Amino acid sequence: MLPPMTYDSRPETFAHSQRVGELMIQLIKEALDRSTCHDRSKTEPPEVEVFNEFTPRLKELTYGSSEYKEALQGMGAGLAHHYANNRHHPEHFDYGLNGMTLVDLIEMLADWKAATERHSTGDLYKSLLINQERFKMSGQLLDILVNTAKGYGWL
């Protein structure tokens, strides 16, 4: 039996819980929307021609190697268009990773994981380390991405 109360915190706690759920649904909806249209810009000009030419080559190269970087440079305007139209890429933002939202980061991490699955030498942890240097990623953000990948069985 509970002692008599002058204040019952439960209604406020339930209201708070409900509000947190509503706010989380905003983020979840955005993530779901992105999951159904990820990289669609690659299926139309000016990107499709560039990705048709370079994707088979990129699959054969080691991610982060000088040859890989050279191939990216060769993608020119098609890749620039892709970055400009897809906010899950740090290159989309003037301030790189620091311009991104949590939903951008979630899509980016999923993209990096899926990309490693397209390469015979793909390794998400190695890719994260390469991208830490490439994008000047903080140790804290690297830890968060590694923890997330481990939590979902990606590492």
Task: Go through the PLM ranges and name each one.
Residues 1-155:
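Metal-dependent phosphohydrolase cores
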